[in-house]
Amino acid sequence: VEYFVQKSIANGIDIIRIFDCFNDLRNLETAVKAAKKEKGHAQIALSYTLGDAYTLDYWKETAKRIEDMGADSICIKDMAGLLLPYKATELVQALKDGSSLPIQMHTHYTSGVASMTYLKAVEAGADIIDTAMSPFSMGTSQPATEVMVETFKGTQYDTGLDQNLLAEIADYFQPMREEALKSGLMNTKVLGVNIKTLLYQVPGGML
């Protein structure tokens, strides 16, 4: 782990996102220390899941422990797209109550609620959201960058990104998307919305 982090930062990776599927922070200590030693940004990602144990107090206390570990930021890793908009409000507020660290949001569009979840999370205080350029967005990917930029335009959350430049980037990648679909590299089954995700709770990366 230490060598991987060292070589990653040496080769230009500045943010090391570190997570444990059980949210057991003991399993993250080595990677966090390694990232800090190499002057990298140590971001701990919390795997969002449902269950009686995962109360707002649980998330608040976990955020406090993460800050005490010396991490630089917290990422909410909603790998299955289970985080609903108003639950995102509560979750971000709980993390903000427990820590002063920046909060980054990561979710998948599999269940169809991701853009709304981002909107409520940002309104609640989330500092960063993960998006994808439109040719590779939606489905098991993330909300489209261009959509979120336009959503926040003219508000206190305005990104300042130029839609004309984003359009050029999207045009550049569009042929790659079409080729990936044509070759079968990109499966059309993962491009749409499947509300059953909220029932079977399978992460986007497994679909």
Name every feature range the model reports, one short phrase each.
Residues 1-17, 21-207:
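Catalytic cores and adjacent flexible loops of soluble metabolic enzymes
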